[in-house]
């Protein structure tokens, strides 16, 4: 049987004989000497076939049928598959199992984004910076970083990549036009006040001011000397008299001074910098083509930026000043065109302003008035490098205003670097709740009791004004909206899943009265200024006390004292109950017994409270520590740290309602008081106080008396009453070491009163001096 060579993967039949008529032998240019076989084809020696036999492959030989052409076999398999019936469908369970085993490309992509900290960034791309915590985390992931996720799949920002800053300008190479920033002249009603009257007026406003050459506070807008057009705009907006922060901030800013304004939320800070900005801009030449802005305001959230934008437009309209709002969620191209056309005032979030500065949409050569509003919140969101980058684009002799509800170290450090000789104005207690807001706390058994409570109280709340309800999660917001909608309430929802257009539409309808109830996450907690809100309901408690303060600050805005804030707290939220007690006390509010009982379940709160009490038993005029009082007439009143007051005024008095001093301050005062008492009890040895050889009688004369040593028990003394002098033995004097002194009355100092005035000479410093 002949063999078939494999050429190119196909079987080629070989003829048994060659004939020149049928086949030409292969032509070769070179034939090796050791290869007599010209066509390199192996032959079988015993193969015999007639010369005219037909070629193999025609189907005649039985041996040829044993080998199958691979191409034919492949095509035959395809035909069989085509003719075969379709396979029966798999059961649903098997299909689901197979699907779970497969790696879905979309799912893998989303998982990879989440692992890298960008799972929520797609919805917040170029959306600015929100006050909703979930959206904040997503937006910051675009500009800044990596996230981790808690058990509820909430993002936690743990690291941020640096936003590429804009190189600061070399202002020494730029020739700036001079400008004026002092427009204030005291009216006789202000300059005529005496120093005592000014001090009393500032005390009534609860204002604390520090700085050089501070202008006096005003009593009305007329004292500012505003133009007639601006005064008409102020009256049109319903402003009757300035708020506390405005009374002191307006004359300072109009005088051209830099200011650090620290005031509680809802105090009217916006008008305190918008009104002087109008005067500042109108004094400068008009903008040329591609110039501007003159006034720049930076805010941490798009809601606050939009709110400032609306407020600024009201006062800029009489002067035809152009105001631009620059924040995320809006077309960047439209904002680019608006800035290119020119505007005098820009209200922006730091991230979007940096983007537009890189796009050359605006130039800062004419900017002379810079405002940083809610500076503490901007630092919380990690905007410090962006703020510094923006400040580096503005001329150094600008006027800079910084407003904040709190003053952390980072904000303090920035203020020292970018402000020039600032005046610091503090209104009320830093970081405290608005005392004008009535706070009501309801302790409920569980979350299931919250909705019935809200349905019962809500109609009465709506009669007083608009209602803002805060919930902790977006799902809870949707649930409350659905429940209230079913019962006919005109309600709207606001949270991080809403796009910017729907948020603006919802807020506009809420302001215009289409909706009477707005339920929201913390997206609305900062900067939302709606004067029609009379009631705030904390349906869920805030994650931290600072956010709680800003939540309830949405009512009682700009001096309105009609606001009420309700907080619903359950039995499981004992930790927050203790913090809420401190907040209520600091704001001068009543603390319900139910809330105090709940707070006492918290070990930390209970330990701190017991330490201020100093134990349960009161002293009865005996020395030593541990008593809650001590001494006659002082049973348990003076409450110091761990039951001691040391006569230094550092204890907590329950009747005065004062806030207890920090532990560090108490210990420092304790140390100082003990050292003073220690030093005053000893005198140095000298020739003038020679020991006497005679012992005084037990009935000591009246000249040998000293007051009891104060301070080692709250309200008490060492060995007796502080208000009653005791006859005691004279203090022993110190003698040289070569002559040991015996602890007898013969070694007593006969003149203790004169020797007490002299300082003891120590050979080495004591431990208290180190």
From Swiss-Prot:
Residues 14-26, 744-753 have a biased composition (Polar residues). Transmembrane segments: none annotated. Keywords: ATP-binding, Helicase, Hydrolase, Nucleotide-binding, RNA-binding. The keyword RNA-binding applies. Residues 44-55, 683-697 have a biased composition (Low complexity). It catalyses: ATP + H2O = ADP + phosphate + H(+). Residues 250-425 form the Helicase ATP-binding domain. ATP binds at residues 263-270. Residues 1-106, 604-640, 683-704, 729-770 are annotated as: Disordered. Residues 34-43 have a biased composition (Acidic residues). Residues 604-613, 754-770 have a biased composition (Basic and acidic residues). Residues 436-599 form the Helicase C-terminal domain. A motif (DEAD box) lies at residues 373-376. One of its GO terms (molecular function) is ATP binding. A motif (Q motif) lies at residues 219-247. Its EC number is 3.6.4.13. Residues 621-635 have a biased composition (Gly residues). It comes from the Eukaryota. GO terms for cellular component: nucleus. PROSITE patterns: DEAD_ATP_HELICASE (PS00039), HELICASE_ATP_BIND_1 (PS51192), HELICASE_CTER (PS51194), Q_MOTIF (PS51195). The Q motif is unique to and characteristic of the DEAD box family of RNA helicases and controls ATP binding and hydrolysis. Belongs to the DEAD box helicase family. This is DEAD-box ATP-dependent RNA helicase 24. It comes from Oryza sativa subsp. japonica (Rice). The lineage of its organism: Eukaryota, Viridiplantae, Streptophyta, Embryophyta, Tracheophyta.
């Amino acid at each position: 049987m002949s063999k078939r060579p494999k050429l190119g993967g196909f079987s080629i039949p070989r003829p048994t004989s060659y004939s020149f008529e049928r086949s030409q032998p292969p032509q070769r240019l070179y034939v090796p000497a050791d290869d007599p076989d010209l066509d390199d084809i192996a032959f079988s020696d015993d193969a015999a076939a007639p010369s005219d036999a037909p070629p193999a492959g025609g189907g005649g030989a039985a041996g040829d049928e044993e080998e199958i052409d691979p191409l034919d076999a492949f095509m035959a398999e395809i035909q069989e598959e085509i003719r075969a019936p379709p396979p029966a469908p798999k059961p649903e369970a098997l299909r689901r199992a197979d699907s779970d085993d497969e790696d879905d490309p979309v799912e893998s992509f989303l998982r990879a984004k989440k692992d890298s900290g960008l799972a929520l960034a797609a919805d917040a791309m170029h959306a600015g910076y929100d006050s909703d915590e979930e959206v904040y985390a997503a937006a910051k992931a675009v500009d800044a970083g990596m996230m981790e996720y808690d058990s509820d799949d909430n993002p936690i920002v743990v690291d941020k990549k640096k936003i590429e800053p804009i190189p600061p300008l070399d202002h020494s190479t730029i020739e700036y036009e001079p400008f004026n920033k002092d427009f204030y002249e005291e009216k006789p009603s202000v300059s005529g006040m005496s120093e005592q009257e000014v001090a009393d007026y500032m005390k009534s406003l609860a204002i604390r001011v520090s700085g050089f050459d501070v202008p006096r506070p005003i009593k009305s807008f007329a004292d500012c000397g505003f133009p007639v057009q601006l005064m008409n705009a102020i009256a049109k907006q319903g402003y009757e008299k300035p708020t506390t922060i405005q009374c002191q901030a307006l004359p300072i800013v109009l005088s051209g001074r830099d200011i650090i304004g620290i005031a509680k939320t809802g105090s009217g800070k916006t008008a305190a910098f918008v009104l002087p900005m109008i005067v500042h801009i109108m004094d400068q030449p008009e903008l040329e083509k591609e110039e501007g802005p003159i006034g720049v305001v930076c805010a941490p959230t798009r809601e606050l930026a939009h709110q400032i934008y609306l407020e600024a437009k009201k006062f800029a309209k009489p002067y035809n000043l152009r105001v631009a709002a620059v924040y995320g969620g809006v077309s960047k191209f439209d904002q680019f065109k608006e800035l290119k056309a020119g505007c005098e005032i820009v209200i922006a979030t730091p991230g979007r302003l940096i983007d537009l500065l890189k796009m050359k949409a605006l130039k800062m050569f004419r900017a002379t008035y810079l405002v940083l509003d809610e500076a503490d919140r901007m630092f919380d969101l990690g905007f410090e490098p962006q703020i510094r980058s923006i400040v580096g684009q503005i001329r150094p002799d600008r006027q800079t205003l910084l407003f904040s509800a709190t003053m952390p170290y980072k904000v303090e450090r920035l203020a020292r670097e970018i402000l020039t000789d600032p005046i610091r104005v503090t209104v009320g207690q830093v970081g405290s709740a608005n005392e004008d807001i009535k706070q009501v706390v309801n302790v409920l058994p569980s979350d299931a009791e919250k909705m019935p409570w809200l349905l019962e109280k809500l109609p009465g709340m709506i009669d007083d004004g608009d209602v803002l309800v805060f919930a902790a999660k977006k799902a809870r917001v949707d649930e409350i909206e659905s429940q209230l909608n079913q019962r006919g309430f005109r309600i709207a929802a606001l949270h991080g899943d809403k796009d910017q257009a729907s948020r603006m539409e919802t807020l506009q309808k809420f302001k215009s009265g289409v909706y009477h109830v707005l339920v929201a996450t913390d997206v609305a907690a900062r900067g939302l200024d709606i004067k029609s809100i009379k009631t705030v309901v904390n349906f869920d408690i805030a994650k931290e006390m600072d956010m709680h303060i800003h939540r309830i600050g949405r009512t009682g805005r700009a001096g309105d004292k009609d606001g009420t804030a309700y907080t619903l707290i359950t039995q499981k939220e004992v930790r927050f109950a203790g913090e809420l007690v401190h907040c209520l006390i600091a704001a001068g509010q009543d603390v319900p017994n139910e809330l105090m009982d709940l707070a006492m379940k918290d070990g930390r709160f209970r330990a701190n409270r017991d330490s201020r009490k100093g134990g349960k038993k009161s002293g009865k005029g005996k020395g030593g520590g541990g008593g809650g009082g001590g001494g006659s007439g002082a049973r348990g009143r003076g409450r110091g740290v761990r039951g001691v007051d040391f006569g230094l005024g550092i204890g907590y008095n329950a009747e005065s309602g004062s806030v207890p001093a920090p532990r560090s301050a108490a210990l420092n005062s304790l140390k100082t008081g003990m050292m003073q008492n220690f030093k005053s009890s000893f005198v140095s040895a000298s020739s003038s106080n020679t020991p006497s050889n005679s012992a005084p009688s037990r009935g000591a004369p009246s000249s040998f008396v000293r007051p009891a040593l104060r301070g080692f028990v709250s309200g008490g003394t060492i060995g007796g009453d502080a208000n009653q002098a005791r006859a005691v033995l004279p203090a022993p004097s110190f003698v040289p070491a070569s002559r040991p002194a015996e602890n007898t009355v013969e070694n007593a100092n006969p003149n203790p009163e004169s020797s007490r005035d002299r300082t003891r000479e120590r050979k080495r410093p004591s431990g208290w001096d180190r």
